[in-house]
Amino acid sequence: MSRKENLNRSSSSNSIEFNRDRDRDSSNISNSSNINCNNSSQTPPIPQHNSLSGRSKHSSPIHSLKKKGSLVRQGIEDLFSSLSVDTHSSSNSNNNSSSNNNNNNNNHNINSSSESSTPTTPRSSFTPQVTMNSNQSSGNNSPQLSSRSSSQSTLIPSNEPTKSLAKFFLLAQQVDYVGDSSSTLLPVENLGLLSIQWKTYFTIGLNSTTTGYDVLKYISIKTNRDLKSLTLADSDGKIIDNDYILTQQRCKKFVVVEDLNIDDLKMKQLNHLQQLPPPSQQQLPPPQSHQQQLLQQQLQQRLQNQNQNQNNNSNSNSNSSSSSSCSTPQSIVSQQQKLHQMLLNQQQIQSSQSTTPTNSSQKSSPNKVTDHQHVENCNFTSPSPSSPSSPSSPSSGMILDGFNLDGNGGRPTPLIITPSSPSSMRKNPPAIPPRSPSSFSGGSPLNNILLNNTELISEPVTTTTTTTTTTSSSSSLSVTTTISNPNYTQNLPTTPLSNSSSNNNNNGSFITLQDTTNNKSIINNNRESPPESPMGSRKSSGSSNTTSSTTNTTTPSSSSLTTSSGKESRDRDSKDKEKDLIGSGNNNNNNNNNNNNNNNNNKVEKEKENYCKFLDAVNSFNMVGNNGVLFNGEANRNMKLTNAQEEKCKILDNYFNHYYQELFKYLHQRHRRIKTIEDFTVESRMDRQGAEQWMKKQFEKETNFLRNKRAGMKLKEFKILTQIGKGGFGQVFLAQKKDTGDIVTLKRLKKQTVEWANQRNQVSQEKSVMLVDNKWITKLLYSFQDANYLYLAMEYHCGGDFRALLNNLGTLSEDEARFYMIEMIEAISSLHEMGIVHRDCKPSNFVLDKLGHIKLIDFGLSKEGIEKRNGWNKATMNELRKSCLSASFTSNTMKAASAYLSGGTNVMAYRRPIAHSAVGSPEYMSPEIVNDQGYDMTCDYWSLGCVFVEMLCGFNPFCADTPNDVFINILRWKETLDWPLFTQELSVEAADLLKNMLMEQPHRLGGKGKQDFKNHPFFKNHNWDEIVNGQVKPPFVPKVESDIDTSYFEDAVNNDSSTWDIDDNDCGGYGSGGYGGGGPQARDPFNNLKIPFFTYRKSSALSLSMSSEIAQSLNYNNGNTYSNYTSNNNNNNLHNNQIHEKNGNSGYNHFHFDSIEQQNQYQLSLLSPNSSDKSIGMIQYIKKFRYQQLQQQLQQHFQQQNHLQQLKSNHRKSPTRQLISSLLYKGDDKTSILQNYSSQSQPSLANQLQSSSSSPSPSLQSQSQSPSLQSSSKSTPNLSSSLLENPVKEELEYKNQTENEVEIKKENESEEIQSLRDQLKEIIIYEDYDQEYSI
């Protein structure tokens, strides 16, 4: 919303006066007020901008917005130009005067002029846009802007520096998390083929001094991650330096990557390696100094081992020299020089011994060693006695920046330097991954030999050849892996295997085993993850294994080299290694005992951590490559895939993920429909044959439903009339279905955009919501897809959206606003009752139908099942992540639960179910969404409160020029909402409703649903139910010429069809060069992505809610059900009839026919191609009229049956008749029974029978005319006249009638009544108008 400010500086009073122009240039009303800010905690005043609005006839606080827009922009441009001129004109010679002015500024007073009817909204200052020294004095036309001073004596506060809010998306590769419905889950999970990535983002305010390092430091603290492993990039993936000022970047979205993926640097590194000279022509440079801290710790550990293992006299001199070099406090550079000299000496010693025979305890002579790497953290291998290229590492060897230090003598051993992997360009080696099995098994990452120089997840592996060599005295195994590729050849890093690997489950090691017979290699590497959080945050990882990492290495058997997934395989590998230790010598017995104790401790710690399942426990698979290489074990994430393979993986991942979601949803709904049909057949008391025929029809409809989903639809079945809207994901058209003539709103979404934005689930959610039978929700009629687009055909509401209504009317009266607020609250609460949060409530998402009632649209941002998704939900996201990383989460959770059940006080504080994703329009977002505090369903009522302010005041309270300013206003909502100004022309009830809706989350109105609004005084004494039932005429009823009138849509484009980008041939076929005909360069995996179960037709609708309602309404014991149902329908149609009569248009919903044949003839005439669009509405009315007639006829039949049944039950309830009936049905002689009743032994019973015979029941009198009764009376001619009149005669007659009761009922029931019942059931259960029309 544009605002205008005239800022004048008064030199006499040294104050700033804001003159607000409201089309009265001659009058300036100023109310000066002095503001002292001696208290530093007081919030500094912010320059208030005026909001000018609306129409004068509505007394809106905002006036002439569109007219003032250009003037405001021109004024601001002039202001900035004057500031820039003053800034550039100042020089260093004016520093003294500038300082004097700065001192005088401390006593300035701020005088602000405001009007009582003008809303004041805090706005962020524009100081970052002008580069200006705070000590320089500005011109007379520029406002005085001073920065906040830390001194308590400062009298003039100033604005805080404007913060430009930016989003930083954290992409962290994590381990898999498997939980049930009651477990805590993170807000967003994206399931990949082999991993799960947790994506979250932070909204951070950027000022003129914020650098990339500040942001990374903040995120590392928030997420408990290592700062060195985080890298900042822009939205295009370009790396940003740490000292770069982020406000200079135009984009406001950044990416923070943990454990930078350098796959894109692989080819560059390989090309660089191919250009290098051979190893014999290179020189070995000293190690780099970027690992100074790690090098010192390794040297200290090496010193401890050298003091314990000084057994070899031949190596004592070198050992003492290395000890002295390490013990003396010297710089890292000098230590590297000495180590380099030690390596040269070792080469000379071994070259002199090359002619002597070698044994298992001696070192072999390698080729000439030179360095051909120019990056740090290289990987090396020791030479083999038999071959210069075969590796052999000494016992207890340690790889230390290019040197292998012998454990026995401490003498460095020359190593063959293999070509570096692309990951060697990494500045720092990664530590132990977070939440991996090794992080809970103890041991510091700095003390772990295997993880010190192991590269993670960046090695492409296709074909490998490996040679292994073992010795008797040094039982260490070193592995060299060579990549064989038609384009290049490269050696992978070498990794020694030690006993400490069993303590860490071989994490971070590449283990290969060669099969020389089949010329194949079996590659086994464990799943690896990014670096872990800081060491201080993981207290549960014990330090008992810190010294075991430097023990002597062993040679595992071939079976132990092939690792398997799961805990059992790891235990089996450790047992195999223990067996190999027995045959390797007695020198490793002590180490075996220590490792066994460490393994037992690790098992206990692993059992505590039982709520996570890691991906290394997933079943392995086998894959044979192009060169005959067998990949056994887990999927190698380091393998480089081609573009075609990546496309296929993405397509399969998206397809199967969505396929099974929709399949399970359909199966659940189908089960509910079958249960409803079975219940209906039982309650309707249908005979077996009729029930089977009726259920057969329902099963046929279910089959047609599935067949229509598979058949699909095409765009050429619709005729595009005009474009009525355009959004971020597609376009909205007004279209007509060619075969039925339905006027629909056709929403087209581009698949590539939807998939790129990860909005596939949102589209499915929107479709599911529109399928619900709800009067406030726009219904979905059709849905289909082609190769490039998704299409949703919905009901068309010709009244336009509510935004257009507000733009035309300006403001509404309280009575008009009350009507629309009641319908909006009903629409939102109906979604909440289904467990759905809309999250995007704004005027443009409410539309008006042809009668003027509210309909809710656009459910793309809705969210379902917050309670099921988040479970217990911690208070903040940080606590949730800490609980997941904590090793004692399960025990703490169980203690908290037990304390809660027992009524204890030490209960962890859990909040209500909340969500954390930030969605919605900026002006209508609640503070908890902007502040990322978690929200519930009441966030929709905050947005509705903003809409209510627009109805009554004509403007949005948080409106600003940029989204960043809008967010700042929302975060400072208590200062922004000037209630005395906003509510000065409103009633007390309306003002109270606004204050309660725009309130903090716990105290916000609507926490208990719509009942809170019904009890509010603004709605309490008004006709809420009448408005909901449609008995009150809306304040605005659209006046349209036809069903395709788009006069109420401001964005309608009726002339240029070339901009619609519509192809009747579905533009989705394959081209000659790839997907979509774009050639090989235009291949996109999302172009041909078919979303399963997306096709939908209203003719195949299987409404579950309608079936459940009918099952309840068809209660034959209550004869008033149908009359109540009919009266409700009449009440609902009363309002529509009154509107048509008042408008002078009878409409097309009123037709009366004398016979059914006339209706059928008229129906067939409407199906002709020349019929208008209104014929569909006429046919619908005919069906409803026929439905009412069937109801009335069937109701009369049921009433007769119920009356007859009631008479029979009353007749059988008489105690005397029950006694006589029991005697008669025993099979005794009728004459003897009558004589016994007439004897003197039972005078009371005879008198009772005679007295009861004097008043026979009316039912028997009415039935005396029946032939069955006459025949039964003739069968007893010998009875006396007195006994013929008693109830015994009546009971005999009733017995004869009951024997043939079923047959008489079937004969008397006419075929017409039976047909009416079948037709009524079919119409009630499935209102399938399309199939009826085709008939």
From Swiss-Prot:
Compositional bias (Low complexity): 27-41, 89-117, 133-153, 289-331, 345-368, 382-396, 412-424, 437-447, 462-484, 498-507, 540-566, 586-602, 1239-1284
Superkingdom as given in the UniProt entry: Eukaryota
Biased composition (Basic residues): 55-70
GO biological process: centrosome cycle; intracellular signal transduction; mitotic cytokinesis
Region (Disordered) location: 1-70, 85-158, 276-447, 462-603, 1239-1313
Xref: CDD domains: STKc_Sid2p_like
EC number: 2.7.11.1
Residues annotated as the enzyme's active site: 840 (proton acceptor)
Coiled-coil ranges from the UniProt annotation: 586-613, 1289-1325
One Pfam match: Pkinase
Record's compositionally biased regions (Polar residues): 8-17, 118-132, 485-497, 508-528
InterPro entries given in the database record: AGC-kinase_C (IPR000961), Kinase-like_dom_sf (IPR011009), Prot_kinase_dom (IPR000719), Ser_Thr_kinase_AGC (IPR050236)
CC annotations in GO: centrosome; nucleus
Catalytic activity: L-seryl-[protein] + ATP = O-phospho-L-seryl-[protein] + ADP + H(+); L-threonyl-[protein] + ATP = O-phospho-L-threonyl-[protein] + ADP + H(+)
Keyword check for ATP-binding: yes
Binding site for ATP: 724-732, 747
Compositional bias annotation for Pro residues: 276-288
Domain Protein kinase intervals: 718-1019
Family note: Belongs to the protein kinase superfamily. AGC Ser/Thr protein kinase family.
Name listed for the protein in its UniProt record: Probable serine/threonine-protein kinase ndrC
Source organism of this protein record: Dictyostelium discoideum
